[in-house]
Amino acid sequence: MSPLRIALAQINSTVGDLEGNARRIAEFAERAHAAGAHLMVTPELALCGYPPEDLLLRPDFYRACARSLDALAARTANIAVVVGHPEQYRGDYFNAASLLRDGKVVATYRKHRLPNYEVFDEQRYFSAGYQPCVIEVQGVRCGINICADVWEPGAADAAMQAGAELLLALNASPYHMTKQATRYEVLRERIQATGLPVLYANLVGGQDELVFDGASFAMDREGRLTHQLPQFSEALAIVEYAGGELRAGAVAPSRTLEAEVYEALVLGVRDYLGKNGFPGAIIGLSGGIDSALTL
């Protein structure tokens, strides 16, 4: 049997720019299709950007997201896509991920674990889902989790019990120093508990005070890293799954800590200016260490 080819789409979304985000997802889907992928996975809430905050208190925003999702499904009919988006369903609101296939929305997963600490306040906006979602692509059963779902036991186990052979994790995981090592540790715990290989698609870009570093990756059922996308830039990688195993692929080189922090600062400032439409910036130099770092 030919391998299942899954594209990890490391996308830089802008909060509230539904048209621009959908266009970017469609562009990545075209690239993934051209590379022979059967399925593409986006980051968490890629359609609306993360964190959308009080936009999620507006019913018209959910309606606009639903229209954008339907239009995106029509634009990506030549490849299956799992896309993160907010959803209004039966009077409740969810952090969701849907499978788009053949021009339609055919399945939806609703995030189980809603973080409510530090920069996260998802319980303010969303209800928690409770059902697993397992989709079949090229004969392979893929479970879906969203970000915090893989940081605790429960949701990944439910996907495994529902028959998943591998796990697709959509994420909007902000950067801090040593964060990637923590992600590896957490995902290896889920892999050890479930026996499922994991494909981890993370958001990249600056949004207000947050920086998302991307660094998406794939791990096999032994917890070995098979693919690693770069930090702080958009990227697309094709992961092959055959015979119950992930095939080894490209692993981006790691940076020194100093280079990593520098790239995070550059990306955060660049996107803060660009996404807010500022024409430039005035830099006030006091002579302290903050001024030296800015220069």
Regions found by a protein language model. Name each.
Residues M1-G284, I289-L295:
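Enzyme catalytic cores with a strong preference for nitrogen-chemistry domains
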